[in-house]
Amino acid sequence: MTRIAGINISDKKHILVALTSIYGIGISLSKKICFSIGIRCDVKINSLTKEKIESLRSIISKFLVEGDLRREKTINIKRLMDIGCYRGLRHRKHLPVRGQRTKTNARTRKGPRKLIKSR
């Protein structure tokens, strides 16, 4: 297990897939990181040298990942709620924010149906 950005990454995975286990790094960013270091994407983590792993750590430390990214995201949502804009109100009411319909859909965002007692 290799530890990068505070996350234990399995040595058996290919580097392209292994980097996506870090919150904030997807496939495209993982490809860019591999290209900048000069590593092929189909190489497994356990075959990397210590220098390559250190260069991986240094490049990933420049990005906003894991706890910092989560904190930034919650601060942005809290800011929207504090200024009272439409998006902030939708966040506060736990409704879809981006204009989706709510009459029949949006069960994921609204949560399970509230049962109404029969008379």
UniProtKB/Swiss-Prot annotation:
**GO MF annotations in UniProt:** rRNA binding; structural constituent of ribosome; tRNA binding
Looking up InterPro entries in the UniProt record yields: Rbsml_uS13_C (IPR027437), Ribosomal_uS13 (IPR001892), Ribosomal_uS13-like_H2TH (IPR010979), Ribosomal_uS13_bac-type (IPR019980), Ribosomal_uS13_CS (IPR018269)
Q: Which UniProt keywords apply?
A: Ribonucleoprotein, Ribosomal protein, RNA-binding, rRNA-binding, tRNA-binding
Q: Which GO terms describe its cellular component?
A: cytosol; small ribosomal subunit
Summary of subunit composition and partner proteins:
Part of the 30S ribosomal subunit. Forms a loose heterodimer with protein S19. Forms two bridges to the 50S subunit in the 70S ribosome.
Q: Which NCBIfam families match?
A: uS13_bact
**Family label:** Belongs to the universal ribosomal protein uS13 family.
**Biological role stated in the UniProt entry:** Located at the top of the head of the 30S subunit, it contacts several helices of the 16S rRNA. In the 70S ribosome it contacts the 23S rRNA (bridge B1a) and protein L5 of the 50S subunit (bridge B1b), connecting the 2 subunits; these bridges are implicated in subunit movement. Contacts the tRNAs in the A and P-sites.
For this entry, the protein name equals Small ribosomal subunit protein uS13
Q: Which organism is it from?
A: Buchnera aphidicola subsp. Cinara cedri (strain Cc)
